[in-house]
């Protein structure tokens, strides 16, 4: 218990020696925090790009500067920042004079994700994670062999609860087909770009199909969640295995046919495939069913021998069987004052408005229940405004 001061007040007015006998003079909007023997300097722009906030590291022992690989999409530069060191290798960064939906960010410098990325990249790494108020419902991963009816079940959910569920838009490196729209059917991207983003840990799952990459990015899931909807991922067992190993906390459901004979009858009833294609799908389905039942990935297994009963069971699993369709509820924004001081008290951050004409407003951030993190969002923030004495 007790009060601890924030570590944001160092604006580097005297600069640092850059290791070559020349002082580096950060701009007066830069903010630094000290963790051990290293100062993390936040400000300016990233690699000359004025749209993204820069990060530099100064090692007090070697007196050298370094520019780390910065993962994730960070905050845009603004008129000033406050920063405070948090436990578990994170720095809370608050943008001054910004609305609450764009003011709270976390810079991860020594989390499990960062340590993993350092091993993969072989260099210094930091990562941004946007802070989001409140929690969100877990995304839903639904897998099953072709012809089992999982697409129909998902369509029924989307039709009955259009404001509750949403699809993530996958990425692919193949060329768009006729009538396909970028950002609607797929995010069409360059192979080199997608390979780099996969290496940077931005994808939950990916696969190479006929020489083209397909995958689900973390951002595409977060965008659905940010809109107030619960994200549904319709992916195969291989993709579900990758999602299970990621930082995403999801519900995993596998849809099984009542029998292989029933599945074969359904595939033949489509009348859209040759005998060779049907036999290939059956072989793939048999392998996928065995993997789905024995992999330990899926907490729930549904047997679709009756569509209406299976749909009712699915809704029960998701806790929505007796719910009426509802619209998403928007969280009211709170503007953070341009001039303020920051104090840390246990898991709470107290932001006190300062300057002339202030209204003695104090904003309290409760971080006791935060979850998630880079390369996705950090959720669970509780934010409130109180009158200070």
UniProtKB/Swiss-Prot annotation:
At the top level of its lineage, which domain of life is listed?
Answer: Eukaryota
Record field: transmembrane: none
Q: Which GO terms describe its molecular function?
A: ATP binding; guanylate kinase activity
> Pfam families in the record, alphabetically?
Guanylate_kin
For this UniProt record, the keywords arranged alphabetically read as follows: ATP-binding, Kinase, Nucleotide-binding, Transferase
Residues reported to bind ATP? 144-151, 304-305
The Guanylate kinase-like domain, residue ranges = 137-319
**Record's protein name:** Guanylate kinase 2
Q: Which gene encodes it?
A: GK-2
Q: Look up the EC number in the record and give it.
A: 2.7.4.8
